[in-house]
Amino acid sequence: MRTEKLFFCILLVFFFCLEFNRGQNNGKTLVDVGVVTDVDTSHSKVVMLCINMSISDFYSSNPQFETRLVVNVGDSKSDVVGAAIAALDLIKNKQVKAILGPWTSMQAHFLIEIGQKSRVPIVSYSATSPILTSLRSPYFLRATYEDSFQVQPIKAIIKLFGWREVVPVYIDNTFGEGIMPRLTDALQDINVRIPYRSVIAINATDHEISVELLKMMNMPTRVFLVHMYYDLASRFFIKAKELGLMEPGYVWILTNGVIDDLSLINETAVEAMEGVLGIKTYIPKSPDLEKFRSRWRSLFPRVELSVYGLWAYDATTALAVAIEEAGTNNMTFSKVVDTGRNVSELEALGLSQFGPKLLQTLLTVQFRGLAGEFRFFRGQLQPSVFEIVNIINTGEKSIGFWKEGNGLVKKLDQQASSISALSTWKDHLKHIVWPGEADSVPKGWQIPTKGKKLRIGVPKRTGYTDLVKVTRDPITNSTVVTGFCIDFFEAVIRELPYDVSYEFIPFEKPDGKTAGNYNDLVYQVYLGRYDAVVGDTTILVNRSSYVDFTFPFIKSGVGLIVEMTDPVKRDYILFMKPLSWKLWLTSFISFFLVGCTVWVLEYKRNPDFSGPPRFQASTICWFAFSTMVFAPRERVFSFWARALVIAWYFLVLVLTQSYTASLASLLTSQKLNPTITSMSSLLEKGETVGYQRTSFILGKLKERGFPQSSLVPFDTAEECDELLSKGPKKGGVSGAFLEIPYLRLFLGQFCNTYKMVEEPFNVDGFGFVFPIGSPLVADVSRAILKVAESPKAMELERAWFKKKEQSCPDPITNPDPNPSFTSRQLDIDSFLFLFVGVLLVCVMALGNFTYCFLAKDQVSYLDKVEMSPCSSSQQMPVKRKTQLNMSQVHDQDSL
């Protein structure tokens, strides 16, 4: 150690003497600049070497410049006040034109005020706190990256892996606190909670660190973001590994405050950090950088070059360029005029006449430095790329990059457009080794195995205990909770990728009665008395304002059930009810129309339709009506009469078969129709209705306009059946409102006399309740989907939603035993086409007959009767034909 210090001092003296002699021999203008640093630290060693190498390299490359920087070192002694004293001394006694440094953000906070008062630019290469930016001092320039820039890559990593909670761990000073406002805003953008902030004192003992780590161990959150100095981080992670916080399941993310100084951390501490992700300042490769690194390794093989050294190198170069461009005129300080009053030492410094001009030239300096593009934008450098590293064994491994505009990518030349929207984290980053040498991505949240069990509230029900039932074991006096909701929850817990310990706590009073309604039960989660609620808890918007629900594990809604009545009155005229009166009337008219038409076509040449008028009238009726039951004895001979009879036979066949089927249905089947068809009819009539006690339905009914006096609560299915069977006239209700799962259970027991007629309210279903922001919500919701898509869900439904009355259908396959239907009479519209067809045949037959009848030539008419389709006599035997012709002639003569 003493050898390194001696070597360091020799180098400083060497560079100082070299530059001083060069300035004197060449007649150059010497310009004093100050460096405020912690001389006895490793950082200071690297920084001072880089500053002097920068001066040497710059003037060697630019021997024509008229100015030469002379470095004056002020030792801050690792103290805020020491930094202020060193700066005052440099300005007052050395009249430095600018100050490089200081090292920490706290020291820079004081120096900014000094630089503002004296107009001396302060150029820092290591103060990264965003708080310094808020001071808005034009004389403070940051030749480094502000910490808030790395918030975006941190946000991208957390979003990529889907972690829902993050605990920041930061040092208790300006450096640690500065990043928090930006970090909080960034995490809120992606709905990530910060349940706790772990603040570590800068001089914390190992015991104090252990106490804080134990707090973190007992939290469910497993994602931690560490923002502190490298020396404190080394002790922190050694303790974390000792206490078991570097095991599988944990996630640690380090900011560049630690990663950039990883080479300064001892090997034991780096081994303890294995599996940690880190944000590292990206230094682009360049030929100048490679040459500088090679020269550094040859000159100082035992000293590790840091990014702060590169920034100090570039800051010194920028200062040399700016001083040369600003010129050498008016480099004095104006003294404060003594008016006889006491003047503070800060006021006694005077004002730099060179400072404003130097500041303007510094803001315009732009060049390609060792650390990348050097250009001040709003007083600081602007990064566009950060490197993502994974600590493995005793070193770091690059696993990707964060690029502004592209996000996380494996390679710098990779474009965001080349990554699919359905990509996984492996498309954005290379392989990661997590703490405990785990390969799978940690969930980021876990119930502490050494912590307490989850306190899960369950409702105390008196009815519909198939869903949730709370009993006491008479032997052990322990609480036994069963039911569909409980079994489904336990199946979901088994699907989680981690163990969850829990206990069911009934929501009841000391006397065993329920302690309130479901709103009261849900509110207990908001108050922190329960960690969750499991049961038949409906997902409602007003409840979601203070708790989080999982995905529904069973569909729900509110159904209206009413009593069913048989609309068919079984009396002595029941046989008339299958057909409507219109169809009856149309059928009778059709009978007479067909009979009369056949008579008109046949009576002149068919003896079966001739005779006395009374005989002919009876024949017409007999022929028309007998076709319903058997073929009539009368034969028809004309073509059109036969066509009409065929059409009529087909109509009668269809009509009689339909009548028979409808009458059989009326005589053998009991068709139940609801007494009420909708909720609006209940409101219009002012009927009394029932609802489930302790449910949200009461509020919904009041919103729809039901007065409190018309609402009757019930608890059990038996109470609901009693109220509906009594009816409103006997103190009962006209209808009852139940949620669909309860309704299925009710109809599985009382299916023969009740029916659901409407679903007036839609709700999401039953869900499990957790506190707002609980990471369990996402995991449990995914597990619900797994169970719902597996045969286990159907097994649970069959086990609990089973019929209790053997005559009832299965409530799973047929939840509504009386599906909606309209028992209607057969009407004319069902046979309209057939009736129209028969009518058309009648019209055509009568038209043809009229045409033949109106023929003037009787002989021609008789010939036509014999030869035309009006007669089918050609088909008759000759003897029979002669008899018919003689009869026709006789009849014609009588006309």
Curated annotation (Swiss-Prot):
Extracellular side: 24-582, 657-830
UniProt keyword list: Glycoprotein, Ion channel, Ion transport, Ligand-gated ion channel, Membrane, Receptor, Signal, Transmembrane, Transmembrane helix, Transport
Cytoplasmic topological domain: 604-610, 632-635, 852-895
Higher taxonomy: Eukaryota, Viridiplantae, Streptophyta, Embryophyta, Tracheophyta
Name of the featured protein: Glutamate receptor 2.3
Main location: membrane
Family: Belongs to the glutamate-gated ion channel (TC 1.A.10.1) family.
Subunit structure: May form heteromers.
Tissues expressed in: Expressed predominantly in roots.
GO BP: calcium ion transport; calcium-mediated signaling; cellular response to amino acid stimulus
UniProt subcellular location: Membrane
Gene: GLR2.3
Any one Gene Ontology molecular-function term assigned to this protein's record: calcium channel activity
